[in-house]
Regions:
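Extracytoplasmic copper-binding redox domains, predominantly the cupredoxin/blue-copper superfamily
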Residues: 19-142
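Positively charged n-region of N-terminal signal peptides that target proteins for export
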Residues: 1-4
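Bacterial N-terminal signal peptides
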Residues: 7-15
Length: 142
Protein backbone atom coordinates (compact mmCIF):
# COMPACT_ATOMS: atom_id res chain seq x y z
CA UNK A 1 0.00 0.00 0.00
CA UNK A 2 2.82 2.37 0.91
CA UNK A 3 4.59 1.63 -2.40
CA UNK A 4 1.43 2.32 -4.37
CA UNK A 5 1.00 5.67 -2.65
CA UNK A 6 4.62 6.61 -3.39
CA UNK A 7 4.18 5.64 -7.05
CA UNK A 8 0.97 7.64 -7.36
CA UNK A 9 2.48 10.73 -5.71
CA UNK A 10 5.67 10.45 -7.77
CA UNK A 11 3.69 10.18 -10.98
CA UNK A 12 1.59 13.20 -10.00
CA UNK A 13 4.57 15.42 -9.21
CA UNK A 14 6.52 14.36 -12.29
CA UNK A 15 3.54 14.99 -14.53
CA UNK A 16 3.08 18.44 -13.02
CA UNK A 17 6.61 19.50 -13.92
CA UNK A 18 6.22 18.14 -17.46
CA UNK A 19 2.96 20.03 -17.98
CA UNK A 20 4.43 23.33 -16.81
CA UNK A 21 5.11 25.40 -19.92
CA UNK A 22 6.51 28.64 -18.57
CA UNK A 23 8.32 30.63 -21.26
CA UNK A 24 11.31 32.96 -21.22
CA UNK A 25 11.64 35.81 -23.72
CA UNK A 26 14.76 37.97 -24.04
CA UNK A 27 14.47 41.72 -24.66
CA UNK A 28 17.23 42.55 -27.13
CA UNK A 29 18.74 45.37 -29.17
CA UNK A 30 19.64 42.93 -31.95
CA UNK A 31 18.79 39.39 -33.00
CA UNK A 32 20.17 38.32 -36.36
CA UNK A 33 19.31 41.10 -38.80
CA UNK A 34 16.51 42.50 -36.64
CA UNK A 35 16.89 45.41 -34.24
CA UNK A 36 14.84 46.14 -31.10
CA UNK A 37 13.20 42.74 -30.77
CA UNK A 38 11.89 40.16 -28.38
CA UNK A 39 13.57 36.77 -28.85
CA UNK A 40 10.16 35.15 -29.43
CA UNK A 41 7.38 37.00 -31.23
CA UNK A 42 4.61 34.52 -30.36
CA UNK A 43 4.42 32.13 -27.42
CA UNK A 44 1.62 29.71 -26.66
CA UNK A 45 1.03 28.77 -23.04
CA UNK A 46 -1.59 27.19 -20.81
CA UNK A 47 -3.74 29.04 -18.29
CA UNK A 48 -1.72 29.54 -15.12
CA UNK A 49 1.67 29.57 -16.87
CA UNK A 50 4.14 32.41 -16.45
CA UNK A 51 6.14 34.30 -19.05
CA UNK A 52 9.50 35.68 -17.95
CA UNK A 53 10.96 38.58 -19.93
CA UNK A 54 14.71 39.01 -19.45
CA UNK A 55 16.32 42.44 -19.93
CA UNK A 56 19.39 41.22 -21.83
CA UNK A 57 20.10 44.73 -23.14
CA UNK A 58 19.15 48.09 -21.65
CA UNK A 59 16.25 50.31 -22.67
CA UNK A 60 13.43 47.77 -22.94
CA UNK A 61 10.25 46.85 -21.10
CA UNK A 62 6.92 45.07 -21.60
CA UNK A 63 3.57 46.87 -21.86
CA UNK A 64 0.23 45.25 -22.65
CA UNK A 65 -1.31 47.18 -25.54
CA UNK A 66 -4.59 48.94 -24.72
CA UNK A 67 -7.43 46.92 -26.26
CA UNK A 68 -5.03 44.06 -26.97
CA UNK A 69 -5.77 41.79 -24.04
CA UNK A 70 -8.78 39.70 -23.00
CA UNK A 71 -11.58 41.35 -21.04
CA UNK A 72 -10.84 41.49 -17.31
CA UNK A 73 -7.05 41.81 -17.67
CA UNK A 74 -5.58 44.80 -15.85
CA UNK A 75 -3.00 47.17 -17.32
CA UNK A 76 0.55 45.84 -17.18
CA UNK A 77 3.69 47.85 -17.80
CA UNK A 78 7.09 46.83 -16.49
CA UNK A 79 9.87 49.27 -15.63
CA UNK A 80 12.66 49.82 -18.14
CA UNK A 81 15.82 47.71 -17.85
CA UNK A 82 14.26 45.19 -15.45
CA UNK A 83 13.48 41.50 -15.77
CA UNK A 84 9.76 40.99 -15.35
CA UNK A 85 7.20 38.22 -15.28
CA UNK A 86 3.47 37.79 -15.61
CA UNK A 87 1.27 34.83 -14.67
CA UNK A 88 -1.51 34.42 -17.23
CA UNK A 89 -4.83 33.47 -15.64
CA UNK A 90 -7.30 34.58 -18.33
CA UNK A 91 -7.37 32.82 -21.71
CA UNK A 92 -6.98 34.74 -24.96
CA UNK A 93 -4.45 36.68 -27.01
CA UNK A 94 -2.26 39.25 -25.26
CA UNK A 95 -0.58 41.84 -27.50
CA UNK A 96 2.38 43.66 -25.96
CA UNK A 97 5.19 45.96 -26.98
CA UNK A 98 8.27 47.70 -25.68
CA UNK A 99 7.09 51.21 -24.81
CA UNK A 100 10.11 53.10 -26.22
CA UNK A 101 10.46 50.88 -29.30
CA UNK A 102 6.86 50.14 -30.31
CA UNK A 103 7.25 52.17 -33.50
CA UNK A 104 10.34 50.14 -34.38
CA UNK A 105 8.35 46.90 -34.34
CA UNK A 106 9.25 45.55 -30.91
CA UNK A 107 5.98 43.69 -30.33
CA UNK A 108 4.85 40.20 -29.44
CA UNK A 109 1.83 38.05 -28.70
CA UNK A 110 1.10 35.55 -25.94
CA UNK A 111 -1.69 33.07 -26.68
CA UNK A 112 -3.16 31.58 -23.52
CA UNK A 113 -5.17 28.36 -23.56
CA UNK A 114 -5.19 28.33 -27.38
CA UNK A 115 -8.06 30.84 -27.10
CA UNK A 116 -8.25 33.32 -29.97
CA UNK A 117 -11.68 34.72 -29.14
CA UNK A 118 -10.35 38.31 -28.92
CA UNK A 119 -8.61 38.18 -32.32
CA UNK A 120 -10.94 40.86 -33.73
CA UNK A 121 -9.84 43.22 -30.93
CA UNK A 122 -6.18 42.48 -31.73
CA UNK A 123 -6.82 43.36 -35.40
CA UNK A 124 -8.37 46.74 -34.40
CA UNK A 125 -5.31 47.98 -32.49
CA UNK A 126 -3.66 51.07 -33.98
CA UNK A 127 -0.12 49.75 -34.33
CA UNK A 128 2.61 52.32 -34.87
CA UNK A 129 5.37 52.47 -37.48
CA UNK A 130 7.06 49.16 -38.23
CA UNK A 131 4.74 47.45 -35.72
CA UNK A 132 1.91 47.62 -38.29
CA UNK A 133 3.64 45.25 -40.69
CA UNK A 134 4.92 42.93 -37.97
CA UNK A 135 1.49 42.77 -36.29
CA UNK A 136 -0.11 41.87 -39.62
CA UNK A 137 2.42 39.05 -40.11
CA UNK A 138 1.86 37.77 -36.58
CA UNK A 139 -1.93 37.89 -36.93
CA UNK A 140 -1.77 36.03 -40.25
CA UNK A 141 0.35 33.31 -38.64
CA UNK A 142 -2.21 32.58 -35.88
Amino acid sequence: MKKILIIILSTFFLSQSVLAADQTIDMLNKLGKEHMVYSKKIVKIDIGDTVFWKAKTRGHNVEFIKGGVPKGVEKFRSPLNKDTEYKFEIPGIYAYWCTPHKGMGMIGFVIVGNDKSNLDDIKKIKYLGKSKKIAEELINSL
